[in-house]
Design a protein with these regions (language model features):
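Boundary/junction segments of secreted and surface-exposed precursor proteins
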Residues: 2-22, 27
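Short strand-edge motifs at loop-to-beta-strand transitions and within beta-strands
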Residues: 23-25, 68-72
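Extended extracellular/luminal ectodomain segments enriched in beta-structured repeat modules
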Residues: 29-36, 82
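Short beta-strand/loop motifs in extracellular/secreted proteins, especially
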Residues: 33-35, 44-48, 102
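Non-cytosolic beta-sheet module surface loops
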Residues: 39-42, 93
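Short, surface-exposed beta-strand/strand-loop-strand elements in extracellular ectodomains
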Residues: 43-58
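Surface-exposed, short loops/turns at beta-strand junctions within beta-sandwich domains
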Residues: 74-84
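Short beta-strand-plus-loop segments that form exposed binding edges in beta-rich domains
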Residues: 87-97
């Protein structure tokens, strides 16, 4: 199954900076399994949330600075369309902060490549 356009694959690292909220969509595919994310929000605290179709799957414990790991169970609906296998990762910088730098990596379910 091909991923939808403008959607990143899993096993991808995303980097950014600036202010406000950054949303990136990732295709995890139809195979269920545990998904692990690593992140580095550096000095300026950021909040990271992962959503599937508007439902929160995982999040950092508020605004955090530094390295961390988070994970969630991926249980996609069987027989879905490619959009059913997409999650949205939302990174929000500290409100009022002029800039922030961060990166994260999101793995594939069950550690597959």
């Amino acid at each position: 199954m091909e991923r939808p356009p403008n959607v990143e694959p899993c096993n991808t690292e995303v980097q950014s900076g600036g202010r406000g909220i950054t949303e990136t969509r990732h295709f995890l595919g139809p195979t269920p399994g545990r998904v692990t994310m690593t992140y580095n929000t550096r000095i300026e605290p950021d909040r990271i949330r992962v959503y599937h179709r508007g439902r929160l799957l995982s999040e950092t414990p508020g605004f955090v600075a530094g390295n961390g790991t988070m994970s969630f169970d991926w249980n996609p609906p069987p027989g879905g369309s490619p959009e059913d296998y997409v999650v949205t990762v939302e990174v929000m910088g500290t409100p009022g902060s002029p800039s922030t730098r961060w990166d994260y990596g999101i793995g594939c379910p069950g550690g597959r490549r």
